[in-house]
């Protein structure tokens, strides 16, 4: 209740609702936004990584913008980075996506620079200052490219994207039979 009062008295809702589509219910704020901020505010003496995984187009980036703005207003040292910012640069991205059966320029597993992502997150977790890559999807006629770096010294880092936390099938496992992490196994109609 104290958290709710702090959010209401700070004007958080009025100053940040413009980041969310007008047609969307503000219930998302109470059910998702505030619980994430509550978790972020819990212990600011150590660095905490929060993963946010959801399907493309459902509002992860919009929520991330809201979280950063709300956290700034509340004095929380929170920053959001998208897994999309860790796409390979243009040349490597084109090589990685060449011949994919869907003909898409990015987004599939294999289009992200996972060593850079892991190295960056490990360095950040150890307390080091890191620079996060930025990716602009509008460059190269919508195929996208890296477009610079931004500084990150936040105590709380939210990593948003799809496939965040997903594990690949192990050798010998199949979608039909599942793996230990697929329970129950996926049916053909799924």
Question: Where do the PLM segments sit?
Answer:
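The Walker A (P-loop) glycine that initiates the GxxxxGKT/S ATP-binding motif of P-loop NTPases
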Residues: 54
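Charged, amphipathic alpha-helical linker segments immediately N-terminal to NTP-binding catalytic cores
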Residues: 1-31
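ATP-dependent NMP and nucleoside kinases share a basic, alpha-helical "lid"
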Residues: 143-190
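Hydrophobic positions on the alpha1 helix immediately C-terminal to the Walker A/P-loop
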Residues: 63, 67
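Walker A (P-loop) phosphate-binding loop of P-loop NTPases
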Residues: 57
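Pre-Walker A adenine-sensing motif
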Residues: 31-43
């Amino acid at each position: 209740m104290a958290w709710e009062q702090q959010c209401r008295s700070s004007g958080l809702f009025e100053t940040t609702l413009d980041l969310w589509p007008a047609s969307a219910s503000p219930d998302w704020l109470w059910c998702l936004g505030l619980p994430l901020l509550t978790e972020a505010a819990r212990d600011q003496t150590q660095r905490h990584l929060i993963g946010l995984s959801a399907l493309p187009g459902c509002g992860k980036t919009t929520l991330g913008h809201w979280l950063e703005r709300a956290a700034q207003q509340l004095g929380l040292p929170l920053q959001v980075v998208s897994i999309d910012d860790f796409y390979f640069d243009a040349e490597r991205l084109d090589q990685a996506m060449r011949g994919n059966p869907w003909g898409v320029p990015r987004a599939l597993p294999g289009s992200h620079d996972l060593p850079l992502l892991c190295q960056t997150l490990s360095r950040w977790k150890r307390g080091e200052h890191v620079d996060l890559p930025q990716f602009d999807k509008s460059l190269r006629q919508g195929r996208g490219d890296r477009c610079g770096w931004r500084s990150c010294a936040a105590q709380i880092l939210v990593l948003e994207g799809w496939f965040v936390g997903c594990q690949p099938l192990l050798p010998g496992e199949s979608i039909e039979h599942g793996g230990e992490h697929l329970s129950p196994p996926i049916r053909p109609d799924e």
